[in-house]
UniProtKB/Swiss-Prot annotation:
UniProt keyword Transcription present: no
Source domain of life: Bacteria
Listed GO CC annotations: bacterial nucleoid
Protein name: DNA repair protein RecO
UniProt keyword list: DNA damage, DNA recombination, DNA repair
Gene: recO
Family listed: Belongs to the RecO family.
Any Pfam family the entry gives: RecO_C
Length: 241
């Protein structure tokens, strides 16, 4: 059987000389892995993580790992390797997809979101965009957080916390007596302001980390590569603050 699709290479593991197992996040079929061979200098450039490729997967049976062939559509790596924030953000989002999506599980809408994020990241690193990506990933996995109104009073004013149980915003008035049991809600997520303080960045990363760890990673740790990104962003801002 054959599968043709467009996708982003998210993993590449050596199998033997010039042969690798690649994993591609495809637009219409989710994650697919296959054996790919680098037969020339050109193909070595094609099979890089983050490359957008025309993907052909061939196997006798669907359950087989199959043979993968790719043609390059777009490469981002040149934009990322010259900037640590871009590179670490890129590595983090790829590692999260690799960990959370299951092989051959369809995620139709998320592919275009990933491409849009990578296009924007190639131009400029934006922390707000990164957090929005993590929030979208949580929503894709069934854990959409709601910042639109207080989950108790329905007010849209003075939202200050997030309930760790419901994933819904809580107003300052309602939440103040229970603030030790609630998550602080970063103001930039409500205002859209890209002038984000170090404390707001810490709050935002703690917020998404909480839901990743509680509902998705459970007893195993989040990807180490994401932690590298988190530490870099917070340490970099602490030094320049």
């Amino acid at each position: 059987m054959n599968i043709k699709d467009i996708g982003v290479i998210i993993a590449k593991k050596p199998l033997k000389e010039n042969t690798f197992i690649i994993t591609v996040f495809t637009k219409n079929h989710g994650l697919y892995s296959g054996v790919a061979k680098e037969s020339s200098k050109k193909s070595k450039f094609i099979y890089q993580e983050g490359n957008v490729v025309d993907f052909l997967w061939q196997a006798r049976l669907h359950e087989h790992i199959g043979i993968a062939k790719c043609e390059l559509v777009k490469s981002y790596i040149g934009h990322f390797i010259i900037n640590k924030a871009k590179l670490y953000a890129f590595n983090s989002v790829i590692s999260l997809i690799k960990e959370l999506f299951h092989e051959r599980e369809e995620h139709y809408n998320f592919f275009s979101l990933l491409i849009n994020y990578l296009d924007n990241l190639a131009k400029n690193f934006c922390f707000h965009d990164y957090i929005n990506f993590e929030l979208a990933l949580l929503a894709e996995m069934g854990y959409e957080l709601d910042f639109t109104k207080c989950g108790v009073s329905n007010t849209t004013q003075d939202l200050a916390y997030l309930s760790p149980k419901s994933g819904r915003a809580v107003s300052y008035e309602v939440g103040a007596p229970y603030k030790d049991k609630l998550l602080p809600l970063p103001k930039f997520l409500l205002s859209g302001n890209d002038k984000i303080t170090l404390e707001e960045k810490r709050q935002a990363l703690n917020l998404t980390s909480y839901f990743f760890n509680r509902y998705l990673f459970h007893n195993h740790r989040q990807p180490e590569i994401r932690q590298v990104f988190v530490e870099y962003i917070l340490e970099k801002d602490a030094i320049t603050a």
